[in-house]
């Protein structure tokens, strides 16, 4: 491989060096093109200096190779001279053609250049004889060439002429290009004289033929002569060639344009006013485009809550029609159209139009504020009602969730439920003094609508069907759209119990500007009030000594059906049931949910027939025993035999759980019909007895010292029990066993007297305090008695309940999870109960510890500590243990 050769090329006192790294593969055409580009020349003649310092022309590849050999001898360097124009061996061209050519090139090259070119051409020509100058004889100068080939001088002339025409054409194109590129500096006057081609001899013959721009360099502040560099993005920035080679104070990302000469032959004044907005050529515009940041605008849907007309907790009269207004702001960049609607999510507040679940919103532009309105009707029953909504555009939800929350006041007229209750109870005052106590309970705030249903069932059978129908229609539930429910909504505590707004005194105001929390914050100094259930009211009635007598068999059946519809509407408000059905519907796709689940009345009766044991020591729950006329005397020694049965089954969820798996005790004989297996329990806890009302005319046998019940007529009932006597809600007190006892059915009782005086044994302390959280609603009071068809109906309800329980594995799992969450929620926010410290023996403590071990809580010390902390309430202990384990799992995972 040949060594590298350095070519030192000189053109009119301008020297440039070229390094030929691979001379063997570098051709003469490459060198010639490189020199033309470097010096901005079109036609050149290159000569090099040999050893004798004589100029030798290079016109071919062979001559170039000889020059490379000479460079090796001179230390791998070669001195080269560049001359404009080619060596032409012809005479002077005809005068006419020459005149035209000079006229065409006026202002391009000085006249001395062409005169010198003529002298060079004339000196190299071989002049013929006298006559040859005029006649151009071909044979004289080309004796050795064929006749059809033109003479050399003619060929050379045509070649020179062609090159000159091409050069002129290129220069004209450059002129048009520079008219767009050359932008004037505003500080140098309105009409830039430096752009026009000067015609003075001084300008034409500047050193190295460089043009003076009459522009000061922005870096060195000297006049720019020769090559000028102009910023393509900043037209007012110009620097000279020397400053461009070194550091200069400008953005290095801006492209600099190299300009050798200005616009040529500009006839019109080139003023700033004419070219106020100069544009760069398309090629440079393409270079500038990537430098501009691209900020695409993405369509976004967003909204913000601004204001409302009815704040949360507004008191309204029943049946009042009102319109809720929300002021919403379109904070996105998409205009709201007819496809933008306010969709109903969930709630129990009655709509003015039950079919209008989607409300049109105003067509708001981005940044505008409008009013969204929904018309509601206040329900007939007093309480707190809410309705939740959210904006949606073509099925895509956006913006904060808004809601309407009102409090319906009691009836102000004489026909209010409380006044009706007053009338019914006052009519029975003459029968017994205890009816006055019952009136006090019925007028309490917690009894509200269910107290009305209870009294109507006991008092008048004619008005019950219509009233129950009204109650069921007023408590109509709306099933939300599954598409609009988000994970945030499903996990919200507001969906765990859709009546959560009825447990709080008020609901916080809507949170504005798109900040909807996962759960509405609890108001300060607001106690948690649970909506009383039917079982609670029965407990209150029983605690006051009130006992209602049964109706006739046909009337009781009809009332039971009506009460079932009322209770069905009440149970439909369970948030657990609602969320479970929503999730199951989303899992089963097209399967429609059963929004009217089987009446809990029957399913609970099935459960009452089985001795399902609840959590021990729960001060919020009471054993409800149904008896008819007198208490059954039980021995104290039987308690120890049944104590083991108390610990067999424990429910880990709250009293609001839907279904249970019951482990039957050994004493329950499944081979006999249900009517033959009858149980009765006695409460012999010293100093404390609790009773609750069951079916109409059924009284709990709880007082050991009592011999019988005294009816208004003074007659005593025989010691017999109906089949409904065996149904007990095993919400436990302190270690009270179930003692089986077989009894017979009693004769039907007259319904003439609504009250029966209830004698309690001496020392019996009847509780009158309403617990914060009610027990499971006792819904068996509407069942008929004394028929074999009752047994079949209860067995059918048992089968139906088991089928409903096992209908969906996924639904069961979801129910269980949400029940536990609801239990934790209620356990968190329910205040500590005010009860006496229970007396728990060592055996009972050991049984509780064994239950906790079976559940998987094996920390004996922690279990004992929590049992003492919660007064041996195993439900609260399990709830706290679950929370501790859940917190530990979360901390280990994250």
From Swiss-Prot:
Binding-site list for Zn(2+) 2: 231, 234, 250, 254
Residue span(s) of domain UBA: 841-885
Composition bias type Acidic residues, residue spans: 630-646
Biological role: Acts probably as a receptor for selective autophagosomal degradation of ubiquitinated targets.
Residue positions, PTM Phosphothreonine: 516
Domain note: The PB1 domain mediates interaction with SQSTM1.
In-chain residues carrying the UniProt-annotated modification Phosphoserine: 116, 520, 526, 555
Record's protein name: Next to BRCA1 gene 1 protein
Species the sequence originates in: Pongo abelii (Sumatran orangutan)
Single GO MF descriptor: ubiquitin binding
Domain of life of the native organism: Eukaryota
Disordered: annotated segments: 630-656, 678-721, 776-807
Residue ranges annotated for the PB1 domain, each copy included: 4-85
Subcellular localization(s) per the UniProt record: Cytoplasm; Cytoplasmic vesicle, Autophagosome; Lysosome; Cytoplasm, Myofibril, Sarcomere, M line
Gene: NBR1
Signal peptide region: none
Span of zinc fingers (ZZ-type): 212-264
């Amino acid at each position: 491989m040949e060594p590298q050769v350095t070519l030192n090329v000189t053109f009119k006192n301008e020297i440039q060096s070229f390094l030929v790294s691979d001379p063997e593969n570098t051709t003469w055409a490459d060198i010639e093109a490189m020199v033309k580009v470097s010096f901005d020349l079109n036609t050149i003649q290159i000569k090099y200096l040999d050893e004798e310092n004589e100029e030798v022309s290079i016109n071919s590849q062979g001559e170039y190779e000889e020059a490379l050999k000479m460079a090796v001898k001179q230390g791998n360097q070669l001195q080269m001279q560049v001359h404009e124009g080619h060596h032409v061996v012809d005479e002077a061209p005809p005068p006419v053609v020459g005149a035209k050519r000079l006229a065409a090139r006026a202002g391009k090259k000085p006249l001395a250049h062409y005169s010198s070119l003529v002298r060079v051409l004339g000196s190299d020509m071989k002049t013929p004889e006298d006559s040859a100058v005029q006649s151009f004889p071909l044979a004289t100068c080309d004796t050795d060439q064929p006749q059809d080939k033109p003479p050399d001088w003619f060929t050379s002339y045509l070649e020179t002429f062609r090159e000159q025409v091409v050069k002129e054409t290129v220069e004209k194109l450059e002129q048009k290009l520079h008219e767009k590129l050359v932008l004037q500096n505003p500080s140098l006057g309105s009409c830039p004289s430096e752009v026009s081609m000067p015609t003075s001899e001084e300008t034409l013959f500047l050193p190295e033929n460089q043009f003076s721009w009459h522009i000061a360099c922005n870096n060195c502040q000297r006049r720019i002569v020769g090559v000028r560099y102009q910023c393509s993005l900043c037209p007012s920035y110009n620097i000279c060639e020397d400053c461009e080679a070194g550091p200069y104070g400008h953005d290095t990302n801006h492209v600099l344009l190299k300009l050798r000469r200005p616009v040529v032959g500009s006839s019109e004044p080139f003023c700033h006013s004419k070219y106020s907005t100069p544009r760069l050529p398309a090629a440079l515009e393409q270079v500038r485009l990537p430098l501009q940041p691209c900020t695409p605008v993405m369509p976004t849907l967003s909204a913000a809550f601004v204001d409302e007309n009815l704040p949360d907790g507004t008191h309204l009269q029943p049946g009042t029609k009102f319109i809720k207004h929300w002021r919403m702001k379109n904070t996105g960049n998409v205009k709201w159209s007819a496809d933008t609607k306010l969709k109903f999510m969930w709630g129990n507040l009655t709509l003015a139009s039950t079919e209008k679940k989607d409300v049109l919103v105003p067509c708001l532009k981005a940044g505008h504020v409008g009013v969204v309105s929904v018309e509601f009707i206040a329900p007939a029953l007093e309480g707190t009602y809410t309705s939740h909504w959210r904006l949606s555009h073509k099925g895509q939800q956006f913006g904060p969730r808004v809601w309407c929350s009102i409090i319906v006041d009691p009836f102000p007229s004489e026909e209010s439920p409380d006044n009706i209750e007053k009338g019914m109870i006052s009519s029975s005052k003459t029968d017994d003094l205890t009816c006055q106590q019952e009136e006090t309970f019925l007028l309490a705030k917690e009894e509200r609508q269910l107290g009305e249903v209870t009294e109507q069932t006991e008092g008048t059978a004619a008005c019950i069907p219509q009233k129950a129908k009204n109650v069921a229609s007023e408590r109509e539930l709306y099933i939300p759209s599954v598409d609009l429910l988000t994970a945030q909504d499903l996990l919200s505590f507001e969906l765990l119990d859709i009546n959560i707004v009825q447990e709080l005194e008020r609901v916080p105001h809507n949170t504005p500007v798109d900040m909807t929390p996962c759960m509405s914050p609890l108001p300060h100094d607001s106690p948690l009030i649970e909506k009383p259930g039917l079982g609670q009211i029965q407990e209150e009635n029983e605690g006051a000594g009130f006992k209602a007598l049964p109706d006739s068999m046909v009337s009781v059946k009809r009332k039971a059906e009506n009460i079932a519809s009322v209770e069905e509407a009440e149970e439909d408000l369970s948030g657990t049931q609602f969320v479970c059905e929503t999730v199951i519907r989303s899992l089963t796709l097209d399967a429609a949910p059963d929004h009217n689940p089987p009446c809990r009345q029957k399913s609970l009766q099935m459960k009452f027939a089985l001795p399902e044991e609840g959590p021990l020591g729960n001060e919020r729950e009471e054993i409800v025993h149904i008896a008819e006329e007198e208490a059954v005397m039980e021995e104290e020694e039987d308690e120890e035999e049944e104590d083991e049965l108390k610990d067999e089954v424990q429910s880990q969820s709250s009293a609001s759980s839907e279904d249970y798996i019951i482990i039957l005790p050994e004493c329950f004989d499944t081979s006999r019909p249900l009517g033959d297996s009858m149980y009765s329990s006695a409460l012999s806890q010293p100093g404390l007895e609790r009773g609750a009302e069951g079916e109409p005319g059924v009284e709990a046998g709880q007082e050991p010292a009592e011999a019988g019940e005294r009816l208004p007529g003074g007659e005593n009932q025989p010691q017999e029990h109906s089949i409904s006597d065996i149904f007990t809600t095993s919400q436990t007190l302190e270690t009270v066993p179930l003692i089986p006892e077989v009894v017979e059915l009693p004769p039907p009782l007259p319904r003439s007297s609504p009250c029966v005086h209830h004698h309690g044994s001496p020392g019996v302390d009847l509780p009158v305090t309403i617990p914060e959280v009610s027990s499971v609603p006792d819904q068996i009071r509407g069942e008929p008695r004394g028929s074999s068809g009752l047994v079949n109906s209860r067995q059918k309800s048992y089968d139906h309940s088991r089928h409903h329980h096992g209908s969906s594995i996924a639904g069961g799992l979801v129910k269980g999870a949400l029940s536990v969450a609801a239990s934790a929620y209620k356990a968190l926010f329910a205040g500590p109960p005010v009860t006496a410290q229970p007396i728990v023996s060592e055996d009972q403590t050991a049984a509780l510890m064994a239950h906790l071990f079976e559940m998987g809580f094996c920390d004996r010390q922690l279990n004992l500590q929590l049992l003492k902390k919660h007064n041996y309430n195993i439900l609260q202990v399990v709830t706290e243990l679950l929370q501790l384990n859940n917190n530990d799992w979360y901390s280990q995972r994250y």
